Amino acid sequence: MGKDDVVQSGAGGGEFAAKDYTDPPPAPLVDAAELGSWSLYRAVIAEFIATLLFLYVTVATVIGYKHQTDASASGAGADAACGGVGVLGIAWAFGGMIFVLVYCTAGISGGHINPAVTFGLFLARKVSLVRALLYMVAQCLGAVCGVGLVKAFQSAYFDRYGGGANSLASGYSRGAGLGAEIVGTFVLVYTVFSATDPKRNARDSHVPVLAPLPIGFAVFMVHLATIPVTGTGINPARSLGAAVVYNKDKPWDDHWIFWVGPLLGAAIAAFYHQYILRAGAIKALGSFRSNA
């Protein structure tokens, strides 16, 4: 008997095997009925506000750190390099905000806060096309508004310190930047799938682990690895919002990396989880044979 099965007594005294978890049905590709549901628009609003707050806190942290460590601005000379929250603090800001916001919005919208996450879940048929598109639009608009708030509150420093925009660091090729974004987003989306897997939830129901916790830690760890390369995108809305508000040439030069990389990473993670770990291809083949 496989690990996915438990033994239950049948009505006739026999025994039969049944799953100890239930997979939700696949979301329809297009669900027109969703457009008449308030729950959809409530979820879209939640994604907008969550992404706005995410960009506001994280970009403000980046700008503040750069100001604190600017020797010419602080007058601290060589000691300025030891000031501020540091790269570790920036990574904590991103990971911590994801933990908080996913916890707050998971029951309303699923807590995506990232077009790459939404795209991966759409490919896995966890959300419909209508919901996925509305989420992505809301996330991008929320990101622009969030960075806009940072510029409004820190207008003296926003442009001077790069507006928190992602760009390819000097010394790295476009291939290296693209690869870093693909791998980083794969780690994040793979963690999302694993943390929300109904099989894991059934087996680990006795362990009080919140799904937002590993997701936030994944964001934290990826930032530590990727900040020196691209400033860490792994979220097209985050990269777009900062690029739009900052609106200088450098962030736009290689902006495609921060869309292509995360979307590819999300697609690979969705395929790996659904068709390798969850054996989706084998299940589909078995269903085809049984119906033949």
UniProtKB/Swiss-Prot annotation:
It is found in: Cell membrane. The chain crosses the membrane at residues 43-63, 82-102, 133-153, 175-195, 207-227, 257-277. InterPro entries: Aquaporin-like, Aquaporin_transptr, MIP, MIP_CS. GO terms for molecular function: water channel activity. It is a multi-pass membrane protein. It comes from the Eukaryota. SUPFAM superfamilies: Aquaporin-like (SSF81338). A motif (NPA 1) lies at residues 114-116. Keywords: Cell membrane, Membrane, Repeat, Transmembrane, Transmembrane helix, Transport. GO terms for cellular component: membrane; plasma membrane. This is Aquaporin PIP2-2.
